[in-house]
């Protein structure tokens, strides 16, 4: 077997971009940044909030409207 082929597995800090929470875990990456953690996730907090990343819903609706308009004009 080859020696020293595996990456170093060390303690890293995970930072939440939403609430600022941080905790320590182990990984091969130097730092980990997450959008939502267990302190601010709607499932764990019991609060219903809309989590929309970069307007994906609006982008989908805009594309869907274009495709339905194209189909209507083709008929």
Curated annotation (Swiss-Prot):
According to its UniProt entry, the function of this protein is described as: Binds the 23S rRNA.
Q: GO terms for CC?
A: ribonucleoprotein complex; ribosome
Keyword RNA-binding attributed:
yes
Pfam families in UniProt: Ribosomal_L31
Q: Which gene encodes it?
A: rpmE
Instruction: Please list the coiled coil stretches.
Output: none
UniProt organism field? Pelodictyon phaeoclathratiforme (strain DSM 5477 / BU-1)
A Gene Ontology molecular function term for this protein is:
rRNA binding
Report the protein name in the record: Large ribosomal subunit protein bL31
Oligomeric form and interacting partners: Part of the 50S ribosomal subunit.
Looking up InterPro entries in the UniProt record yields:
Ribosomal_bL28/bL31-like_sf, Ribosomal_bL31, Ribosomal_bL31_A, Ribosomal_bL31_sf
- Taxonomically, the superkingdom here is Bacteria
What the record says about family reads: Belongs to the bacterial ribosomal protein bL31 family. Type A subfamily.
Entry's Gene Ontology BP terms: translation
- List UniProt keywords, sorted A-Z: Ribonucleoprotein, Ribosomal protein, RNA-binding, rRNA-binding
Which HAMAP family does the entry link to?
Answer: Ribosomal_bL31_1 (MF_00501)
């Amino acid at each position: 077997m080859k020696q020293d082929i595996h990456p170093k597995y060390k303690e890293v800090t995970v930072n939440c971009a939403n609430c600022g929470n941080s905790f320590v875990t182990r990984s091969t990456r130097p730092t980990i940044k997450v959008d939502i953690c267990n302190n601010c996730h709607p499932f764990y907090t019991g609060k219903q909030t809309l989590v929309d990343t970069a307007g994906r819903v609006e982008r989908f609706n805009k594309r869907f409207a274009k495709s339905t308009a194209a189909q209507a004009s083709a008929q």
